[in-house]
Amino acid sequence: IHYHAVIYQALKYAMKTDMVPQNVAMKVDRPRKNSFQPTFLDAEQMQKLFEVVKGTRLELPVLVAAFYGLRRGEVLGLKWDAIDFNRGTLTIKRTVTEATIDGTMKIIEQDSAKTKSSLRTLPLVGSFRDYFQKVKEAQELNKKVCGNCYNYEYDGYVFVNELGERMRPNYLTEYFPKYIAKHGMPKMRFHDLRHSCASLLLANGVPLKQIQEWLGHSDFSTTANIYAHLDYRSKISSAQAMEQGMLLPRSDDFGSRWENVTEQGKITEPDLNPGF
């Protein structure tokens, strides 16, 4: 779909500027979008995943993405100035992505989130306060040990290695699914941690509107379209509320003998062949 759209727009511009006589892409049907089904981990599977990545470079990115539902670029875009240890907040305001530009793979940094709603401040719960504190202390120690060998170009970023090199987005995309598959986990993408976060929030009774704000979706329809089908628990609650609020007739012999009602409101003998 993406390639078709790019070619279509390029030829549209070329035709507008008289570079080509017609847009031949108009004669090609737009490819159908594949209905991708994300993988949703339940709480038990999530605990197993945490054990699988424990002690690896994947551990903290996985924990952050699973708990906060962050996108890959939001995880790797975290800097220390976004973490307020005193106030206990985590602000999502940067992204780091990877794309091919002029045939070369390049890192793209943006000091703004994907959309205005993506810019959000979330609570820094106790466990994550400890995680980040330990990482920050380790970085300071690495700077002293490495000296001039330390790469200060990415100083301030949370996810760097012992030499200060920043973790690449494609590292998470490529190595995460391969590594966890070797350890018996279901086939899934790194982005599915975000989906799993939403499904766990739903399972614990968090309304879709609050999930929208937690994930940073630009509008409610985005959240509803992706996750509403998981929200069966709320439908059960609605049905129970209706049962309590509405006195339904007893089901004794229900439907065994229906009487006809005329337009004048009179009741007649039941029609054994109603014709519907």
Sequence positions of predicted segments:
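C-terminal secondary-structure termini that scaffold catalytic or DNA-interacting sites
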Residues: 87, 98-100, 104-119, 126-128, ...
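N-terminal core-binding DNA-recognition domain of tyrosine site-specific recombinases/integrases
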Residues: 1-19, 35, 165-171, 186-192
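C-terminal catalytic core of Y-nucleophile DNA break-rejoin enzymes
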Residues: 50, 89-91, 100-101, 110-134, ...
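Catalytic-site neighborhood detector that most strongly recognizes the C-terminal catalytic loop/helix
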Residues: 32, 40, 96-98, 129, ...
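Short, basic (Lys/Arg/His-rich) helix/loop patches that form interaction surfaces
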Residues: 51, 55-58, 68, 122, ...
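Short, polar N-cap/turn motifs at the start of nucleic acid-interacting alpha helices
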Residues: 82-89, 186-187, 206-226, 236
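Basic, Lys/Arg- and aromatic-enriched nucleic-acid-binding interface segment
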Residues: 1-3, 16-80, 85-86, 117-119, ...
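Proline-centered turn/helix-capping motifs that create local helix->coil transitions or kinks
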Residues: 14-24, 85, 94-101, 134-148, ...
